[in-house]
Amino acid sequence: MKPPGDNAPAGCPFSGARAAQPAHEAPHVPGDAAGETGWHDAQLDFSKSMSYGDYLSLNSILDAQHPLSPDHNEMLFIIQHQTSELWMKLALFELRGALDAVRGDALPPAFKMLARVSRILEQLVQAWNVLSTMTPSEYSAMRPYLGQSSGFQSYQYRQLEFLLGNKNVQMLQPHAHRPDILEQVRATLEAPSFYDEVVRLLARRGFPIASERLERDWTQPMRHDETVEAAWLEVYRHPQQHWELYEMAEELVDLEDAFRQWRFRHVTTVERIIGFKQGTGGTSGAPYLRKMLDVVLFPELWHVRTTL
């Protein structure tokens, strides 16, 4: 209780603290409110400097959605795929950085970049949850406006597949109408994949890798090689002696595991929305995507688990 005649507001009865002053009597703190210096001293005038939107080129990004149908749900479809392309751009950037690091025998930076790619793929997996809010009826209303465009025509996704070792010369054809893009995709097809460079790393570390595995036709998909598996077997049996290679192996398994999850969610989302209809690009749709689930990117790393 307050003493008689004491009109001061009471503080906490247990701490003996003074009560806060009423708002209209609160002391002024410079820069704590809107004024000439801005809100909490934040800069508000960007007429002569770069703003957040300027730095991110938001005008270009946010003006890149152009629905062709009158259907409300097409905006979701467009943004889902555009954001996926942005994440794939970052995944390619990180993978190529990791590849350069492996070539230079700088493995710790490569581990960081590979871990980031795995997290990017997790982000892409979660993105399917947003697209799956589209019902079959909603997709059917906008599908005629898509023409023959299809996700398998994504030149960034194709480069990602090639960089991870799933090579297919036929997949150049969808980009023949764009010579600049075709050149990018072809260069990735004809270069060693990330795993090819890791196998070369094994050879540099003294493991006897077959010469035909080290110098092969890079445009062809990888096949299981006994000498590569034997090298990984030694690494897994004696991880303390080959710690960097052991960590590299596990980073690659993490990466392929995340990629498999992305593929699986792709299949289930397609089945949920269009069932087993033919894809807009002419593929069989869900059956084609299910077949892709059987693709193994780093075969020796999976088979060695049985051998151990």
From Swiss-Prot:
Pathway the protein contributes to: Amino-acid degradation; L-tryptophan degradation via kynurenine pathway; L-kynurenine from L-tryptophan: step 1/2
Biological process according to GO: L-tryptophan catabolic process to acetyl-CoA; L-tryptophan catabolic process to kynurenine
Substrates-to-products reaction catalysed: L-tryptophan + O2 = N-formyl-L-kynurenine
Record Pfam families: Trp_dioxygenase
Region (Disordered): 1-37
GO molecular function: heme binding; metal ion binding; tryptophan 2,3-dioxygenase activity
Disulfide-bond pairs as recorded: none
Protein residues bound to substrate: 77-81, 139, 143, 280
UniProt KW keywords: Dioxygenase, Heme, Iron, Metal-binding, Oxidoreductase, Tryptophan catabolism
RNA-binding found in the keyword field: no
Biological role stated in the UniProt entry: Heme-dependent dioxygenase that catalyzes the oxidative cleavage of the L-tryptophan (L-Trp) pyrrole ring and converts L-tryptophan to N-formyl-L-kynurenine. Catalyzes the oxidative cleavage of the indole moiety.
Assembly and interaction partners: Homotetramer.
Family matches, as HAMAP family: T23O (MF_01972)
Name recorded for this polypeptide: Tryptophan 2,3-dioxygenase
Gene name of this polypeptide: kynA
